[in-house]
């Protein structure tokens, strides 16, 4: 499945944004847009539907926070965590993982600005 990933920062400091409108306008099954920088981190919004590939981030932790719908964070070793709206999880650096959404989910991610969304 192709991923539609935009690492460019869409909004500057003090610029208001509507993450819901961005997600609503998304017409592809797997989309990710960097919203803004916060110090050395970046906030991204994603629309997930389907499976991302297994990967890890060697130097950065990654926060996933479900805004709408539900999705799974599958972890190496067989553990799978389901997140529903208003639930989140931090995946520590070095942990092999993938996200999986049987139906459409809208997700906020916060991570170091140096992270590669597709993994190291």
For the regions a language model picked out, list residue spans one by one.
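Short beta-strand segments in beta-sandwich/barrel cores
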Residues: 43, 52-54, 69-74, 88-89, ...
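Conserved short histidine dyad/triad with adjacent acidic residue
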Residues: 28-29, 42-58
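Short acidic-glycine-tyrosine-enriched beta hairpin
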Residues: 77-93
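Ligand-binding loop in jelly-roll beta-barrel domains
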Residues: 93-120
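Short acidic/polar mixed-charge low-complexity motifs
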Residues: 41-42, 71, 79, 95
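A cytosolic small-molecule/anion-sensing beta-strand core signal
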Residues: 39, 67-68, 84-85, 103, ...
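A short, N-terminal "cap"/entry segment at the start of jelly-roll beta-barrel domains
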Residues: 1-44
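Short, conserved beta-strand element in jelly-roll/cupin
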Residues: 47-48, 57-74, 110
């Amino acid at each position: 499945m192709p991923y539609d990933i935009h690492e460019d920062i869409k909004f500057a400091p003090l610029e208001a944004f509507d993450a819901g409108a961005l997600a609503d306008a998304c017409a592809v099954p797997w989309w990710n847009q960097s919203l803004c920088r916060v110090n050395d981190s970046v906030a991204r919004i994603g629309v997930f539907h389907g499976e991302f590939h297994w990967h890890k981030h060697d130097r950065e932790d990654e926060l996933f926070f479900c805004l709408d719908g539900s999705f799974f964070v599958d972890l190496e070793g067989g553990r799978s965590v389901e997140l529903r709206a208003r639930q989140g999880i931090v995946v520590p650096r070095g942990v092999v993982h993938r996200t999986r959404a049987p139906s459409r989910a809208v997700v906020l991610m916060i991570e170091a600005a140096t992270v590669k969304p597709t993994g190291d």
